[in-house]
Amino acid sequence: MTRYLLFALAATALAGAHAGDFDYKAYRPSSLSGAVAEHQKNPAVDFLVETGNFKYAVGGTYTGRHRETATPTRELIRRWVKALRHPKEYETLFDHEVEVESGGKKYWLPIQTPMVQSFASEVRAGGSVKLYIMLLGATKDTWVFAINEFQRQ
């Protein structure tokens, strides 16, 4: 019993040590429009899966709108998971999107499911937020940047 308790305590300590290890420096400062402008896609292509690991730290204003992830975005995420050989569970990692305004444009961004509740409680409609986003690719109509972390401003 004591051995089990020590193992459980060690596992909890290790999990806690890694929980705060988000690598903010891996995200290059930009704007959402700047991040979009860096990439090109063929308009005839329905889906473009990005494998280049492009990460950006961007600012924006939360509009207060959220929704379930749009069907084309879900399909892109499915293809991204398959192409990069991520675990199949990653397909459901981005079940919701939040709308952010930046530079006069509005963007729907998938947010990791474990962060939805904290985002909703910490960021109010009209509030400024710093987003740590990663390019997953593009659908026929839009680029898809997923939120990996956020900081209320």
Over which residues does each language-model region extend?
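Sec-dependent N-terminal signal peptides
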Residues: 2-13
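OB-fold and OB-like single-stranded nucleic-acid-recognition modules
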Residues: 18-153
